[in-house]
From Swiss-Prot:
Record carries keyword Nucleotide-binding: yes
Top-level EC class: ligase
Catalyzed reaction equations: L-cysteine + L-glutamate + ATP = gamma-L-glutamyl-L-cysteine + ADP + phosphate + H(+)
Gene Ontology biological-process entries: modified amino acid biosynthetic process
Annotated SUPFAM superfamilies: Glutamine synthetase/guanido kinase
Family in the record: Belongs to the glutamate--cysteine ligase type 2 family. YbdK subfamily.
Gene3D superfamilies: 3.30.590.20
InterPro entries (alphabetical): GCL_type2/YbdK_subfam (IPR050141), GCS2 (IPR006336), Gln_synth/guanido_kin_cat_dom (IPR014746), YbdK (IPR011793)
UniProtKB keywords: ATP-binding, Ligase, Nucleotide-binding
Keyword Nucleus appears in the UniProt entry: no
Function: ATP-dependent carboxylate-amine ligase which exhibits weak glutamate--cysteine ligase activity.
Name of the protein: Putative glutamate--cysteine ligase 2
E.C. code: 6.3.2.2
Length: 376
């Protein structure tokens, strides 16, 4: 890549340890109608100044975040401490906390935007597609010690994209219609111009050059506006995994965070040992994303650059076995083992369809079931 001017440089904060942080997006639903409620501003105001609770694009959403944690159990306890008081306030106002990749029947046209310049600019630019972002997810940050590691790890992590999406898929419905997808959120979010799969850069300098070009051409004003499914967070010194659909409960959340933590640390340690990390062509990753979004746990995924294929759940078994020693060192062995519970009991998209069938298609029952899964 040609040399860039000095202002292309992006500082990376460097995390001395592979710490984790979790961002968990929740929707507010009316306790009676089970439709979305645009009351996040009032809820956040009542909670008061709290670095663990944030506003988001839409006024039906609150985001609960953990602090910087060393282990998955620590992160889950951190989230619990925030969720308990927050849910009491939400319930006192006649609402419930709800989390899935999408709401089963809400209409995007009735949702109000949060009053903030960056959100106004996003909608001004993206228009109809931006207004349709009625979606919720889970973001997991893992600390990386050097910018030189970020791009190789990010590129290799794409091999596990379908595993994480299939396990977390929780958005089969859109405005009352069964889309036929396990994760309609994955298909929706990539419509934003800076979202979707990341480019497979191998060096930090390539990423710096990309951001320079994006800023020079007016596509972004800040690096945070790069909304890839996996992206660096330079100011935090982390790699941020944004693949997962919204998760309704702490048990599955802990499992998915543990899987993410172990995958990143495993790749980091392999880099330290001068191993060459596995990669695949971008067209394989594009297909894997679509297959996982469409078929969920029934997806047959592409495994490697030689185009070998396998059922995602079969490959997941091998991944979990390989990561067991890593999980023990990271003190999340139980949480990693719980990943296997998701295929065993059914992923969220499967549970949602089951509930709808049992209630003659009444999607309010689906909301009830998802709300009930949040045990704090």
């Amino acid at each position: 890549m040609p040399a860039r001017r000095g202002d292309a440089h992006i500082d990376f904060a460097r995390s001395p340890r592979p710490t984790i942080g979790v961002e968990w997006e929740f929707a507010l639903v009316d306790a009676q109608t089970r439709d979305l409620s645009n009351e996040a501003t009032a809820v956040i105001a009542e909670i008061g100044e709290n670095p663990r609770v944030h506003k988001e694009l839409l006024r039906n959403t609150v985001e609960v975040v953990s602090g910087i944690c060393r282990t998955v159990p620590e992160a889950m306890e951190d989230l619990r401490q925030t969720l308990g008081p927050a849910r009491r306030i939400v319930r006192d106002r006649g609402m419930e906390l709800f989390c899935a990749g999408a709401h089963p029947f809400a209409q995007w046209t009735t949702q109000k935007l949060t009053d903030a310049p960056r959100y106004a600019e996003l909608i001004k630019r993206t228009q109809w597609w931006g207004r349709q972002m009625l979606i919720w997810g889970v973001h997991v940050h893992v600390g990386i010690s050097s910018p030189n590691k970020v791009m190789p790890i990010m590129t290799s992590l794409l091999n596990y994209y379908p595993h994480l999406l299939a396990l977390s898929a929780s958005s089969p419905w859109w405005t009352g219609v069964d889309t036929g997808y396990a994760s309609n959120r994955a298909m929706m979010f990539q419509q934003l111009p800076t979202a979707g799969l990341p480019f497979q850069f191998q060096t930090w300098a390539e990423f710096e050059g990309f951001v320079y070009d994006q800023k020079k051409t007016g596509i972004i004003d800040h690096v945070d506006e790069v909304r890839w499914d996996i992206r660096p967070s330079p100011h935090l010194g982390t790699l941020e995994m944004r693949i997962c659909d919204g998760v309704s409960n702490l048990h599955e959340l802990a499992a998915l965070v543990a899987l993410t933590h172990c995958l990143v640390v495993d790749l980091d340690r392999r880099l330290e040992a001068d191993e060459s990390l596995p990669t695949m062509p971008p067209w394989h990753h594009q297909e894997n994303k679509w297959r996982a979004a469409r078929y969920g746990l029934d997806a047959v995924i592409i495994l490697d650059a030689d185009s070998n294929e396998r059922l995602v759940t079969e490959d997941l078994d091998d991944v979990l076995n390989r990561l067991e020693p890593v999980a023990r060192k990271l003190q999340c062995a139980d949480e990693l083992a719980a990943v296997a519970d998701i295929p065993r009991h059914g992923a969220s998209y499967q549970r949602q369809r089951r509930v709808a069938e049992e209630h003659d298609g009444d999607l309010r029952a689906v909301v009830d079931a998802l709300v009930a899964e949040l045990e704090i």
